[in-house]
Swiss-Prot record:
Gene, per the UniProt record: SMR11
Assembly and interaction partners: Interacts with CYCB2-4.
Keywords of this entry: Cell cycle, Protein kinase inhibitor
Region (Disordered): 1-44
Protein's recorded name: Cyclin-dependent protein kinase inhibitor SMR11
InterPro entries: SMR11/SMR16 (IPR038971)
Length: 154
């Protein structure tokens, strides 16, 4: 019996391993890169004739010498720097998305934070939660000091 290799790619007549070019007239095709509004033109460099798609700005310098079929040696420092830049870009975009989703907070010039409008109620029950009470005067501790000693001290 012939054993099949589990990791071996099998070609069938109906499916192709080659990537397909998106067709804007066909609704089920892959959307074009230009239609993706989350990425700017600076972040995407495409050259359809050579099959190059680059997201990292550090890779733009290698766009003339690199393509999908070519093997290019890259130093470890360049790889780490590229990973760092890409991760930083992802983190900043996620923070930007989260900051848009959160209710904007109002800050005054001296750094004090104003509560958001949803938590500000004019109800008298809420006053104790939002406003601190007046400071309490400490009670004087009464001491019984002998009047003769008091005259000497004061």
């Amino acid at each position: 019996m012939e054993q099949e290799e589990p990791c071996e790619a099998k070609e069938t007549a109906s499916s192709s391993i080659e990537p397909k070019t998106p067709n804007p007239n066909v609704p089920d095709s892959i959307p074009a890169i230009d239609s993706d509004s989350s990425l700017s033109e600076e972040e995407i460099v495409t050259e359809k004739d050579r099959g190059i798609v680059t997201l990292s700005p550090l890779c733009k310098q290698r766009i003339d010498s690199a393509s999908i079929s070519d093997c290019v040696l890259v130093s470890d420092d360049e790889i780490i720097e590229s990973l760092y830049q890409n991760l930083l870009r992802v983190i900043l975009s996620l923070q930007q998305i989260q900051s848009v989703a959160v209710v904007p907070e109002i800050w005054c010039f001296d750094g004090c934070k104003t509560p958001p409008p949803s938590s500000r109620n004019l109800d008298s029950n809420m006053v104790s939660d939002t406003c601190p009470g007046a400071p309490m005067k400490l009670t004087k501790i009464s001491r019984n000091i002998d009047s003769g000693l008091r005259r000497k001290l004061f």
